[in-house]
Amino acid sequence: MMFIPATLGTFVLASLLPATVGAGIPNAAADVAVRALPNAPDGYAPAEVDCPSTKPAVRSAAKLSQQEQDWLKKRRMKTTGAMADFFSRVKIEGFDAVAYLVGNADNVAKLPNVAIAVSGGGYRALMNGAGALKAFDSRTDNSTEPGQLGGLLQSATYLSGLSGGGWLLGSMYVNNDSTITELQKGGSNSLWKFNRSILEGPDDGSSGVVDTAEYYKEMIKEISRKKAAGFETSITDIWGRALSYQLINAPKGGPAYTWSSISQNSKFQSGDVPFPLLVADGRNPGEKLIGGNATIFEFNPYEFGTWDPTIFGFVPTQYIGSKFEAGTLPSDEKCVRGMDNAGFIMGTSSSLFNQFALHLDSQDLPKVVKDSLRDFLSSLDEANNDIAEYKPNPFFGYAKSTSPFAGVKSLPVVDGGEDKQNIPFHPLIQPARHVDVIFAIDSSADTELAWPNGDSIIATYQRSLNSTGIANGTSFPAIPDNNTFINLGLNHNPTFFGCDSSNTTNPTPLIVYIPNSPYVTHSNVSTFNLKYNTTQRDAIILNGYNVATMANATRDGNWPTCVGCAMLSRSLERTKTAVPDACKQCFKMYCWDGTLNSTKPDVYDPKLFLTEVDLQSAAKGLHASGKLSLVAAVVTLLSILLV
């Protein structure tokens, strides 16, 4: 029997809405301790609380928050030691990098300020990004051996993600800085059990298969409590709850776990981990398309807001459910906490269902399915249920002369990659953060066969040139066109952009662009594929590890040295230190030199660099396999939402 949306909706409602709601479903992984902080006052439902003595308010984005400034003092000290450890293993011929770091340790502003950005792209981005972070993490077995890059993560000040990359960050941080190894190990007892899609629900680890109806009942129960408390709900609520069951190690998907609670984690407070940043886009009232001048929002443990001139302001993350007006809380309003549910924040950064609705005609689906989905999604769009709704709008009445959101009671937010900036550069190129180098992990599906072709990094460069002034003082290195990316192999191998800082007027970070490429498996799986067996999951993570290390430096024995040179480059400029000859050779090898080749290339179909991993029952090159998975997701989740 084949269900069309209306039939499936009736079926779902009939089977998932009994008179009483049953007990919760545990989701515990044997090797990942439950260490995050479930500090929401009333589970998933936001609730009023007493305000602190100084009431929260919108602040200008003219500088970093005082909290971030104080945190940076701790983190930069930790990264100095981590970089010294890194360079004790990664050598630069003719240059003592450790002595250089020690000699400038009295002024951390002289030292490298490193950031890592993990792109969107669903589970593909999560797994490929996980492989890179696993390679960069000195806690990973053998990652500090010759040819490896372990310690780069510990050397980073900032770590940004959006969509699938945001899921990766959320799963790591909400589970108290768990390693990728911890998240994936344990087979059937691992936290990352992607062999059961979020449509089915998690495996409870004892009976083998959890009851799917019970799983949906629990999600409906929590979301209904939020709605009963007077807050808007949308598809992002059910999406975020479903993601939480798979990514957060807590019973019922951790409904009380918040994004702001990361700031209360002891590892974060002591500066032992990078500063996590999630990115999402604002959708202007009355619009459906997300353009290059869309307002870009960031979620960090302390604040939510934007550096863009439209709003240029931030509010405390833990209080985003409060009824701010013109930047302050009225005297008769209490504070509200709990709106920043960790799953809802991760879901916000990946709320791409409205994007799917806009591209139905390009999908290889039966006409009856397209028509039914279009009607279904259109009915939701009329009520703005296809996006994440932040109501009350924390920026209501704020920046009235410039903000498209100042006059609306609800702030509509969507997937951070919908403006084509699928790599979350935006929070890292803000002048106030003084980032020197960004290691950009690009898992985008730009080409016909779902490999990157530079679209994301090009979009950020184009935004920096936007005549509307939306870039607001940010600077970005020159980037070539898509065809040049493919013709010159810039999407096939790591490439440095912005090597010569004299080519830009304002300080600009060096970009180390690391595109998804096939090493041991075809990792070009669909953004909309929701299910992977453990073998394929581990193969894609291993592939990402090889992408980041260039096959443990077997493709280029100097790759670790060149990574080190990229880290040091801007710092050497600031201290007027001569660039080592070894680094000059690296820059000659990896820097884009401005050459263009814009002729139309053949279909980009890269071959494996190494011996292919045996995927057993997993399919190879699943770049087109996710369409019906997303159809099922949309139909099922929206049916539930319309209760």
From Swiss-Prot:
CC annotations in GO: cytosol; endoplasmic reticulum; extracellular region
Subcellular location per the Swiss-Prot or TrEMBL entry: Secreted
UniProt EC number: 3.1.1.5
Carbohydrate attachment residues: 142, 176, 195, 293, 466, 472, 482, 503, 524, 533, 552, 597
Keyword terms: Glycoprotein, Hydrolase, Lipid degradation, Lipid metabolism, Secreted, Signal
EC class of the enzyme, as a word: hydrolase
Pfam families the record matches: PLA2_B
GO terms classed as biological process: glycerophospholipid catabolic process
Superkingdom of origin organism: Eukaryota
Signal peptide residue numbers: 1-22
Domain (PLA2c) ranges: 50-597
Reaction equation(s) it catalyzes: a 1-acyl-sn-glycero-3-phosphocholine + H2O = sn-glycerol 3-phosphocholine + a fatty acid + H(+)
GO MF annotation, one: phospholipase A2 activity
Record has Signal as a keyword: yes
Keyword Secreted carried by entry: yes
InterPro entries linked: Acyl_Trfase/lysoPLipase (IPR016035), LysoPLipase_cat_dom (IPR002642)
Similarity comment text for this entry: Belongs to the lysophospholipase family.
Record's function text: Catalyzes the release of fatty acids from lysophospholipids. Phospholipase B may well contribute to pathogenicity by abetting the fungus in damaging host cell membranes.
Family annotation (PANTHER family): CYTOSOLIC PHOSPHOLIPASE A2 (PTHR10728), LYSOPHOSPHOLIPASE 1-RELATED (PTHR10728:SF33)
Descriptive protein name: Lysophospholipase ARB_05919
Organism: Arthroderma benhamiae (strain ATCC MYA-4681 / CBS 112371) (Trichophyton mentagrophytes)
